[in-house]
Amino acid sequence: MVKSMIAVISDIHSNLEALNAVLNDIKNRGIKKIFCLGDIVGYGANPNECVELIRDLNCLSVVGNHDYGVLGKESLDYFNKYGAIAILWTKKVIKNENLKFLDSLPLIIEENIKGKKVIFSHANPKHPEIWEYLFPDYVDDVFNYGDLIFVGHSHIPFVNSEEGNLLLHEGKIYLDEDKKYLINPGSVGQPRDGINKASYCIFDEKDFKIEIVRVEYDIKKAYEKIVKNRLPEWLGERLFLGR
């Protein structure tokens, strides 16, 4: 049933073309509830439009480290040179109301779904403000913090259980309700798993199923906007590579 499904998106990074493609896919599936795992801005050329879409759709969203960078809450020393340049550019163009929205976002959202503690966080929920990466082969002690834990940050989609990695890149998997899982939906706006399609995931609460979904979008248009706004060309080139 569509009512039992939620979409989880992450790491949009001001890529309007990718975000629109993903939101259209979600809409076509009839899914109404969307969670966003942060990093709405950074890297790309449409920060205002992306923030406004997330805000106007009433997505339940947490804040990411690039959002913190634009807010001046995170030192640029912690970003690579391309990320720092994009943050400085974003600070110049972002509207005050969109800054206020980013500033209102929490570090963690906790939900109760079918009696399960479900965590939504940009990075490791152990210390969310440290922005520690979690990967398929490195999950730290994350399973101490919830039953289903959704994180972004690495831009690599995967589903991991306490026993090890279960799913990478794309596909569906039924979860065992007696086990704990770490789920990364991948990145909408800058995938880094070698696949240049936007990535997000769908969680079916009724069937206890996860699907990682890949969506094609107009990469050329996103690239051209980056170049036009004199952002580092590599930020556009990497979109074609999925890196």
Swiss-Prot record:
Gene3D superfamilies: 3.60.21.10
InterPro entries linked: Ap4A_hydrolase (IPR050126), Calcineurin-like_PHP_lpxH (IPR024654), Metallo-depent_PP-like (IPR029052), Pesterase_MJ0912 (IPR011152)
One term under GO cellular component: cytoplasm
A GO term, aspect molecular function: phosphatase activity
Source domain of life: Archaea
Listed Pfam families: Metallophos_2 (PF12850)
Protein known as: Uncharacterized protein MJ0912
